[in-house]
């Protein structure tokens, strides 16, 4: 079996009140990320335990987020600084703390979001769970039943989307039983050779003859140089192109 993970963008259709709540939730979440980022850099620590001690209570009391959202912000910031470390060798090499503006709200499967039996999406917000209408056309049926990972809630051009990574198991592709190689040319249009050691030649004699025929016609008409000859040249060119296809 082959395991494959793909991320699909799913369109959400919240009501105006729900959209406003999602806006406020994302703003609070990103503010949490900004605070954790400043704390992590000033204390030069990526320890989840230490960041919990330093930032968790402040996030809950200042931004009025739930426990899971506070933890999600801490985990996201740790992951982002680790990415900086991988690329620069030092997570603290940037002059300023990492900033979070419009990069969305991370949702953990079965904690922050889940799928209801009627296909709607249940999402954790500042005011508890909301149930949203979803357009599932962007995700193939097979991946709708895959193993979902941490999704990201985004607003693009005034429209809400959820980016969902889905992991599925695929059957191994069948190994080909017969392999054929094809060489293209002029004298022989194609020469094929297959796994049973059979060689087949496809002659280009007819094509060569046709090309010579049209070339002779064009040469004669070009020598005339009349208006009717030019119209005839164009007609012949179109006919030759159709024949070659």
Question: Can you say where each PLM-predicted feature lies in the sequence?
Answer:
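Nucleic-acid substrate recognition interfaces
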Residues: 1-245
């Amino acid at each position: 079996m082959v395991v494959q993970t793909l991320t699909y963008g799913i369109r959400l259709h919240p009501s105006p009140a729900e959209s406003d709540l999602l806006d406020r939730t994302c703003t609070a979440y990103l503010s949490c990320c900004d605070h954790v980022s400043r704390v992590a850099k000033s204390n030069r620590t990526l320890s989840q335990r230490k960041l919990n001690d330093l930032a968790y209570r402040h996030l809950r009391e200042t931004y009025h987020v739930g426990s899971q959202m506070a933890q999600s912000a801490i985990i996201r910031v740790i992951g982002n600084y680790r990415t900086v470390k991988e690329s620069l060798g030092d997570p603290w090499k940037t002059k300023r703390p990492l900033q979070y503006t419009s990069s969305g709200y991370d949702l953990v499967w079965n904690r922050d979001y889940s799928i209801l039996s009627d296909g709607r999406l249940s999402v954790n917000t500042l005011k508890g769970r909301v149930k949203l209408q979803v357009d599932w056309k962007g995700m193939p049926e097979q991946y709708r039943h895959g193993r979902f990972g941490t999704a990201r809630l985004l607003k693009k051009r005034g429209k809400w989307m959820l980016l969902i990574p889905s992991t599925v198991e695929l059957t191994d592709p069948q190994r080909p039983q017969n392999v054929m190689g094809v060489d293209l040319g002029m004298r022989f249009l194609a020469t094929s050779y297959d796994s049973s050691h059979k060689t087949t030649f496809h002659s280009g004699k007819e094509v060569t003859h046709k090309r010579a025929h049209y070339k002779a016609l064009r040469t004669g008409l070009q020598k005339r140089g009349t208006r009717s000859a030019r119209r005839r040249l164009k007609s012949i060119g179109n006919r030759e192109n159709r024949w070659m296809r």
